Amino acid sequence: MDKNNHNMTYHDQVTVQNTLKLREVLKTLPPFAKDYFRAIEPITSAKTRISYAYDIRIFFHFLLTENPSLKNKQMENLTVDILDQVQAVDIEEYQEYLKVYDSEFDKLQTNGERGLKRKMSALRSFYAYYYKREMIKTNPTLLVDMPKLHDKEIIRLDPDETADLLDYIEHCGDQLTGQKKIYYEKTKYRDLAIVTLLLGTGIRVSECVGLDVEDIDFKSNGIRVIRKGGSEMIVYFGEEVELALKNYLEYRNNITPVAGHEHALFYSTQRKRIGIQAVENMVKKYAREVTTTKKITPHKLRSTYGTTLYRETGDIYLVADVLGHKDVNTTRKHYAAMDDDRRRRAAKAVRLRENP
């Protein structure tokens, strides 16, 4: 990402890009929808608003294509009273439609229960805004049950797999030759530093790629990250992360970055700030060699860190704080199965008689 303005941080640039993208998406929605997105601006990120805009657009696309009375209507001509014409049964049909539907671009789309719930949450929020301001008389979204979410098992690396992954990144070049060997040598220290950092701090991949070299403080072994929502936080790291970062920085000193990318901590092979997708592909590439049964992504490395920290400390509030969860219930929900394991061990730990 180009730093045309050297005073802008990576986070600021992403916000600007997302704001511009949102404006483009809003042009494809009914004009009255802008009021809603303007109203939620203070309490949501631009990225969240973009997701909501796409979700709301699917709803209007559904109305225009599936409702016979609206067949000849155009998106730009829809007014707010269209919302009052929708009944609870229409919302239920929409939920059914979301499971499998043709998108505006004639591509078949599907939604699992999480995608379904997110789209329904967006629609509820959209309706609530106009209902609260008495611009519509009814809110049919309140009459329809939200999709039920089933708990998903947390996918994480076991301690042995974590060690195997780091060992593989460090030594897999021994079996390589030719161009593959050259590429590996160019990316080895960077890849090891990124994976070690993700495993050793639990930061998000978006936070990782957004790091500038100035964000690392080896005096306190802390990194400054911009959390989801824009808040700033110092996250501390241990000796293994410190060593991996220092080794990478030594290699990084020999790279001449593309203009505007001088501050980026992690570079792509094009000498620009590395992107989220590049990190995701890199993690998947290495993880496939270590485990074939688990689909490991950067987020799974974050789950691995959270699991390890909770096992070591048993402090759910500490885990929530370090992971940057605003609500401890989010953390507790993810690690509920581990709580059950701890309760089982607690039952065995208490002896009432020495020889029952």
Model segments located where?
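Conserved catalytic core of the tyrosine transesterase superfamily
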Residues: 1-356
